[in-house]
Amino acid sequence: MVGGAGYIGSHACLALREAGHEVVVYDNFSTGHRQATLGNACIDGDIEDSGKLKGIFKKYRVSAVMHFAGLLSVSESVSNPIAYYRANVEGTLSLLSAMVDVGIGVMVFSSTAAVYGKPDYSPMLEDHPTRPLNAYGESKLAIERAFPHYERAYGLKISNLRYFNASGADPKGRLGEAHDPETHLIPRAFEAVSGGRPLEIFGEDYPTPDGTCLRDFVHVTDLADAHVRVLRRLEDGGESGVYNVGTGHAYSVREVVEMIDRITGRRVPVKICPRRTGDPSSLVAASDRIQNELGWAPIHSNLQGIIESAWRWHQTGWHIGAAGDSR
C-alpha cells in the first residue's frame, strides 16, 4: 500500500485486511499519519527510492501494489506544477521500475476525475474526452497514458480508479479525514463551525442552479470497497480497466453547507471568494462500468450519511492530534 497512511489509502488498508489480505504500508508521512496504519506493517520511505521499494517487495513477498501516493491539491498544482509532475509522474515511474525488477505484476492506481476537465456531458463515462484543467489532472493523466506501454512490454496488469469527491469517515469511527492544512470542503466546514476561519466558497457565479460548483460525493468506505473488488478481479486473471468511482448524483457546495448546518446544529460561517483557476463547474460520475462488471454499489454514499460519519469523526478530536504526525 504505497501511500497507505493517507485518507483513502488507510481506509483501503482496512477494507483489504477485513477481506483477508495481509497489508504492508509504505509511506513517507508527508501527509499521512502513523496512527492511521492501525497496526499494519509500516515502512517509512519515499516512492522515488526504487531501491528501497525493491527491498521491501522482496522482504514481504509482495504480490500486488495499490498506489495512493502523490500530491492532490488542484490549486497548489497550478502554482507549483514541478512538484506535481515530480511526485505523480516520476514517483510512479520509480514504483513501476521496482515492480518490474522484482516481478510484481498487478497494480491498482489512484487516479482522479480531474483527468476529464470541463465535461461535455454529465454524468461522464470513462471514454469521455480527457482535457485536464490543471497540473494535478495532467500529471495523473500522463501516468495513466504510460500504463498500456508497461503492460505490453512487461506483462503488468494495472487498473485505474478515477475518483470523484471522496468524503466521509469509517462508519465504526476507526478512521477519517485528517489533512494539515485541511482543504476539502466538508472537514473545512467543520473547522469553520468549530471556531476556525470562515469556509471559503470559490465562486457563486457558475452556470449551476445556485451558482456554486456541483460535485459527486462518494463515501470513502465505498471507495475502499471498489479497490478491493478491482484487486480481486486482477488477481483472478481479469483484464486491466479504467473505472469511474462516484454516485452519479451531484450536490452543490451550498447544498453541502446547508446539510452541515442541519447536522451540526450550527451555521457554517462562509466567505465568498473568486473562482479558483482549474475548477470545472460540475463533475459527476457515470459508474455503470464498475457496478456492472464488479457488482460495486455506493451503499454509504448519501449526503446525510457522509456528513454524519465525518462529523462523528471530527468530534473525536483525532484529526487534531494527528496533525503533528503528518510530517
Residue ranges and their predicted role:
Residues 4, 32-34, 45, 75, ...:
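Glycine-centered small-residue hotspots that permit tight backbone geometry or close packing
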